[in-house]
């Protein structure tokens, strides 16, 4: 369980808004960095997820992940290669969830593939965008739980846009104060997010 406390000189201090702290150092105008929406228990959290894609110096490309399941990353990279045609088989791929947090929720799938595509193409992701969605093997974007809470957290922290699965859109289409962008598949999501 993610503890919402910070260690200060006076001891442990309750952290009232973990999302704010965890995304406060996100670099602007750098490829491979995206804000994702996850849920810990029933509490929504926004986190920064980073990907670095670089040509390999060895015969076999390296795949490394910190904070996310390695097998899930391997699956998502295969989907990117097969469904999008991203030629990453000869590229080292490093994935990191900033803050040392471990996430075991499929809603971060879309963030992983967007960050990888961003790094590979060297196209930064707008800093006012959040992404959430499970990615299926055919490249479809599947619905996530607690979509209303995720969007409320994005609004609270001043984000202007959130990319969500189309199957979640009906429940939140009337929400004001944030642009909600529904997507059906991976190609559509990448094109929307990477064009700004």
Regions found by a protein language model. Give the residues of each.
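Peripheral, non-AAA+ core regions of ATP-driven protein-machinery
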Residues: 3-39, 43-196
């Amino acid at each position: 369980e993610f503890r919402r406390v910070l260690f200060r000189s006076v001891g442990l201090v309750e952290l009232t808004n973990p999302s704010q702290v965890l995304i406060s150092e996100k670099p602007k105008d750098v490829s491979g960095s995206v804000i994702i929406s996850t849920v810990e228990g029933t509490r929504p959290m926004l986190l920064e997820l980073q990907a670095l894609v670089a040509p390999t110096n060895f015969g076999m490309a390296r795949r490394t992940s910190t904070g996310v399941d390695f097998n899930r990353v391997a699956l998502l990279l295969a989907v990117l290669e097969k469904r999008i045609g991203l030629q990453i088989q000869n590229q080292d791929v490093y994935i990191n969830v900033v803050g040392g947090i471990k996430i075991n929720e499929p809603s971060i799938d879309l963030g992983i593939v967007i960050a990888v595509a961003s790094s590979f193409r060297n196209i930064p992701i707008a800093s006012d965008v959040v992404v959430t969605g499970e990615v299926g093997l055919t490249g479809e974007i599947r619905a996530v739980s607690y979509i209303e809470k995720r969007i409320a957290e994005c609004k609270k922290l001043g984000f202007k846009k959130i990319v969500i699965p189309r199957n979640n859109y009906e429940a939140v289409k009337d929400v004001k104060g944030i642009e909600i962008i529904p997507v059906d598949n991976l190609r559509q999501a990448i094109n929307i997010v990477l064009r700004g």
